[in-house]
Amino acid sequence: MNETILVKIITPLSIAFEKQAKMVTMPGEEGMFGVLPNHAPMIVSLKAGLVQVYIDDIYNPQITYLVSSGVTEVTGSYVNIATETAINVTNLNEAEIATKLLELQKPLSEQH
């Protein structure tokens, strides 16, 4: 039984993040959800929000990305998150993250 799962955050321009983790949480269209190793396969629509990656333990996220809407493919051994935009916000404060999230939630026609 695997103790970690490979998490990839993929944008049209690059692989923004790729690392083994104990757990990942993300913003699905129906609400936040988490994925642990050996999760049942699924494909889920994402909305703009925070993806939190738990590298060392499942209680404190070590890496946080702000993503635009997209899609996630989950298997028992990996999670692929495909999104237009992925911003590492691990070291930003809550106000900065909230500002960036509001920008991502705007319709494309209004974004700079």
UniProtKB/Swiss-Prot annotation:
Topology versus the membrane: Peripheral membrane protein
Subcellular location per the Swiss-Prot or TrEMBL entry: Cell inner membrane
Main location: membrane
TM annotation in the entry: none
Keywords noted in UniProt: ATP synthesis, Cell inner membrane, Cell membrane, CF(1), Hydrogen ion transport, Ion transport, Membrane, Transport
Single Gene Ontology MF annotation: proton-transporting ATP synthase activity, rotational mechanism
Signal peptide interval: none
GO cellular component, as recorded: plasma membrane; proton-transporting ATP synthase complex
InterPro entries linked: ATP_synth_F1_dsu/esu, ATP_synth_F1_dsu/esu_N, ATPsynth_dsu/esu_N
UniProt record similarity statement: Belongs to the ATPase epsilon chain family.
Function statement: Produces ATP from ADP in the presence of a proton gradient across the membrane.
Subunit structure: F-type ATPases have 2 components, CF(1) - the catalytic core - and CF(0) - the membrane proton channel. CF(1) has five subunits: alpha(3), beta(3), gamma(1), delta(1), epsilon(1). CF(0) has three main subunits: a, b and c.
Protein's recorded name: ATP synthase epsilon chain
